[in-house]
């Protein structure tokens, strides 16, 4: 009798999963995009644009929930343990790949605890300096760095931030240790850079374009392999062409569901994501943020999973070599 009862529970659970997969999205139930950071930041803005663009292809209300803390790991952990019905997804940035190295104790496994829905966009980085630096181009900057070893300050927006990661990679690329100055966000770091309190910063184009255009900071290069076409940055050379070979750093966003979400639900979410990324209004909003919407191939879940694995392999050694952990 007990065996029969247990079997009936298993059958019921299986049927419930199958019904959830077939009927997704469940009528009158919204889809929640969890953002593992505070409202108002770049990832939050991307998520809100996505929520609007995904409503029609999903045929459901899409809302954003901010679950901030611990460099994005609290929100990501919540999604990893959420119901596997497709109604809770995660929008995360490069921290999805860097957290395994930045945090020595992780509450989830990036590669094993999620279904990868696809990549969304990429945001290039810029290497910039205080306006009073004597160097006017990257070649002159390299000479200046060589003449001032042990005296250079490199700002960032906080441990684990995009600017921190880019700064670590830059130091290793030029084989020079700099004094890392972490701030609580990009705004105060940029203010001190403009004021001459710190020397260098490597941060997103979304944060530096206006200052570069206004000539309140000096631009030494973009971290892409090709020059950017935006008006403020079209004349800024790539670091690669200036001599820092293969220096390619971008901040990206991807979308994920809890591991075990039914395959056909994952397929519906992926299809809705791809439709959203081809929405002209969404593309225009991303361009205004300085972001580039990725191709259909990179929106593929399996393709994105391979990309994240490569990013983990790329950033892990950089972070461990620096010995700068978030916990």
What residue ranges belong to the model's regions?
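Extracytoplasmic/secreted proteins, especially bacterial periplasmic and envelope-associated proteins
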Residues: 45, 49, 53, 74, ...
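Short, low-complexity disordered leader/linker segments with a strong preference
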Residues: 1-28, 326-327
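Hinge/capping helix and adjacent helix->loop/strand transition within the periplasmic-binding protein
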Residues: 22-25, 81-87, 101-188, 239, ...
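N-terminal (or domain-start) structured segment
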Residues: 22-112, 151-153, 159, 175-204, ...
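C-terminal lobe and pocket-closing loops
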Residues: 122, 208-278, 283, 310-313, ...
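Short secondary-structure boundary segments
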Residues: 93-94, 131, 205-206, 224, ...
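An extracytoplasmic/periplasmic, membrane-proximal ligand-sensing/linker region
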Residues: 28-30, 176, 263-327
